[in-house]
């Protein structure tokens, strides 16, 4: 048997689900989209298509549906005079929004399994020598871990609002965490990497002393420290980078099939099937036997035994490497 490589979302059926979604999706595009660089990872490719520029949502939709269907879709946090220029200097940077990234898997220890998609055996290496195929990895994302990520987002919002006077927006990343974004103009947009690093370190609590004896309701870090909040777990590199790509709100995450969605009320957020746009049922063929939590549900799969399951779950399982969606059932 020759070497077998499985690209996430390789299936034509999964592509049709994504294409149908983008035909009518109302993407959350910035008002100044003509100043933003757009980028995407198409189906069946490990590389990104970058340096794209669009002047309207209709032009973008036509490109996505008819030319390059995205597995992952982004625009730049930066504004540029020439966003389609291939040389970063030629783009002429005009400022950037302020970004924070919270990955729940950096907060929790998650169960992960590496296995061969042909024989179904658990394998620690990146290749199954018996079947001469690359192994796949599945990482179980639990609702409890997402809740912990949401709590980090809540603490971050408090710091940005109370200590900086900013108005952040929180987005579910579509997979395993949250993005917090501040739309920046004027001086905020022109913050350089060193200044953004200072903000990142501040929200992470770097160098913030303890305040024993202070009340839990005291303002700022005094109250936070006495409530047991020592800092927010963020990926500091995301905040520092003034030319970072952002997942487009209401786009689909190619590793889950879930929507990148603004969370307007943190108390109401739930990690469940409502985050998927897909309806109906699919026939799903598992690669391995496993019991696992999927979008706050416990799912039992038996290797090689097809099951009829909600499309939201089936597509999620497919993109998480646990098997293949074989058919769509209304």
Curated annotation (Swiss-Prot):
The keyword Zinc applies. GO terms for cellular component: DNA-directed RNA polymerase complex; primosome complex. Keywords: DNA replication, DNA-directed RNA polymerase, Magnesium, Manganese, Metal-binding, Nucleotidyltransferase, Primosome, Transcription, Transferase, Zinc. The active site is at 101, 103, 235. Zn(2+) binds at residues 116, 119, 128, 131. It is an enzyme of class 2 (transferase). Signal peptide: none annotated. Its EC number is 2.7.7.-. CDD domains: AE_Prim_S (cd04860). One of its GO terms (molecular function) is DNA-directed RNA polymerase activity. Its cofactor is Mg(2+); Mn(2+). The keyword Transferase applies. One of its GO terms (biological process) is DNA replication, synthesis of primer. InterPro entries: DNA_primase_S, DNA_primase_ssu_euk/arc, DNA_primase_ssu_PriS. Heterodimer of a small subunit (PriS) and a large subunit (PriL). Catalytic subunit of DNA primase, an RNA polymerase that catalyzes the synthesis of short RNA molecules used as primers for DNA polymerase during DNA replication. The small subunit contains the primase catalytic core and has DNA synthesis activity on its own. Binding to the large subunit stabilizes and modulates the activity, increasing the rate of DNA synthesis while decreasing the length of the DNA fragments, and conferring RNA synthesis capability. The DNA polymerase activity may enable DNA primase to also catalyze primer extension after primer synthesis. May also play a role in DNA repair. Belongs to the eukaryotic-type primase small subunit family. This is DNA primase small subunit PriS. It comes from Saccharolobus islandicus (strain M.14.25 / Kamchatka #1).
């Amino acid at each position: 048997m020759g070497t077998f490589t499985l690209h996430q979302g390789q299936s034509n059926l999964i592509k049709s689900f994504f294409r149908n979604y983008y035909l009518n999706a109302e993407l959350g595009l910035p008002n100044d989209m003509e100043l933003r660089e757009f980028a995407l990872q198409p189906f069946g490719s490990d590389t990104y298509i970058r340096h794209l520029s669009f002047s309207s949502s209709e032009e973008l939709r036509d490109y996505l549906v008819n030319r390059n269907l995205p597995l992952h879709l982004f625009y730049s946090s930066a504004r540029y005079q020439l966003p389609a220029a291939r040389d970063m200097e030629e783009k002429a940077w005009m400022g950037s929004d302020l970004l924070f990234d919270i990955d729940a898997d950096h907060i929790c220890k998650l169960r992960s399994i590496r296995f061969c998609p042909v024989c179904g055996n658990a394998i620690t290496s990146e290749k199954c020598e018996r079947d001469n195929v690359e192994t796949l990895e599945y990482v179980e994302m639990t609702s409890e871990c997402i809740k912990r990520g949401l709590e980090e987002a809540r603490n971050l919002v408090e710091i940005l609002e109370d200590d900086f006077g900013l108005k952040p927006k929180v987005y579910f990343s579509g997979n395993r965490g949250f993005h917090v974004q501040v739309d920046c103009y004027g001086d905020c947009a022109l913050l350089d990497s060193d200044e953004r690093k200072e903000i990142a370190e501040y929200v992470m609590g770097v160098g913030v002393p303890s305040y024993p004896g202070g009340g839990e309701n005291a303002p700022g870090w005094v109250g936070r420290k006495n409530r047991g909040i020592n800092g927010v777990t963020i990926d500091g590199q995301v905040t520092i980078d003034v030319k970072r790509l952002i997942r487009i709100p209401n786009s689909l995450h190619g590793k889950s099939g879930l929507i990148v969605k603004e969370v307007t009320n943190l108390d109401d957020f739930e990690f469940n099937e409502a985050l998927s746009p897909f309806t109906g049922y699919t026939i799903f063929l598992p690669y391995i036997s496993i019991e696992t939590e999927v979008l706050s549900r416990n799912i039992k799969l038996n290797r090689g035994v097809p099951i009829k399951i909600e499309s939201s779950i089936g597509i999620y399982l497919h993109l998480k490497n646990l098997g293949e969606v074989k058919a769509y059932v209304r």
